[in-house]
A protein has these predicted regions:
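P-loop/Walker A phosphate-binding loop and immediately adjacent motor/lid segment at beta-alpha junctions
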Residues: 146-149, 202-250
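Conserved Radical SAM active-site core
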Residues: 57-61, 75, 90-176, 180
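Basic polycationic patches enriched in arginine
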Residues: 14, 18, 31-34, 39-42
Length: 251
């Protein structure tokens, strides 16, 4: 029994302190990476080829954290998708870099997450990873995110946050991670935390950011400004205004 317990914890031994803060009973929710052998590639309309994932399955997820208070305002359900090619030094969740890690993200899982949001004390959904904005993960997420937004429209009290290692400019038309579904995803988001984690800029005092280069973008305000000024989202960025009480938190 002790050996099995240690094996269950082994993936977390490679994570930072943030990952180790998860309750130990969740260690079993991580599944070892599986090979891509035998999986056929998918091609997007713009010609971009994704790694071999079966046609009926676009994405795996590494973990779901219910009642999460670390990844966005309030109490949230957080979905950690699998797959990231960025490889940031000292990433808090490097076990989710492998696209084959975890379990299939299917309709049953979607329904369970949406059901978890249907409580007055839950403030919304957070999507992180891994990298949600990897092209194949965008394809696996877009319909789900639109389902959540339809169930809980803007102003309903349920917000959708997304953490990405991309900067917003990379998600604009012509950017490295812009696909035919990117605009649909961005249209559903209330908050986008953008930018790669940079160890040299690490700052423990930041709320919902790991390093000072990252931004918490208020997407509703950004969309409104972009429309008002007739410019691209990346040229109309409005940063999230946190409660002033947190500005006094220093080390």
């Amino acid at each position: 029994a002790v050996t099995k317990f240690l094996l269950d914890l082994e993936p977390y031994a490679r994570c930072s302190l943030r990952s180790l803060s998860y309750p130990l009973h969740e260690a079993g929710t991580y599944r070892p990476a599986r090979s891509f052998a035998g999986r056929r590639p998918r091609m997007f309309e713009d010609g971009m080829i994704c790694p071999g994932l079966p046609g009926e399955l676009l994405m795996n997820y590494a973990n779901i954290k219910y009642f999460d208070i670390a990844d966005g305002e309030g109490v949230r359900t957080s979905l950690f998708v699998s797959g990231c090619r960025r490889g940031c030094k000292n990433c808090f969740n490097s076990v989710a870099w492998d696209f084959a890690a975890g379990e299939p993200f299917d309709r049953v899982v979607e329904d369970k997450i949406i059901e978890s949001l249907d409580h007055p004390f839950i403030d919304g959904l957070t999507i992180l990873g891994g990298e949600p904005m990897e092209p194949e993960n965008q394809a696996g997420l877009v319909d789900f995110i639109e389902r959540v937004r339809a169930a809980y429209p803007s102003g309903s009290g349920k917000t959708i946050w997304c953490f990405t290692g991309d900067v917003l400019e990379e998600l604009m038309p012509g950017g490295r991670h812009h696909t035919e579904v990117t605009d649909r995803i961005l249209a559903c988001l209330d908050m986008l935390v953008d930018g790669p984690f940079v160890q040299d800029l690490y700052d423990i005092t930041l709320r919902f950011r790991g390093s000072s280069n990252q931004r918490v973008i208020d997407m509703n305000a950004t969309r409104a400004r972009a429309e008002r000024e007739g410019v691209a989202l990346c040229d109309a960025v409005e940063l999230w205004r946190d409660d002033p009480v947190y500005s006094t938190h220093t080390m």
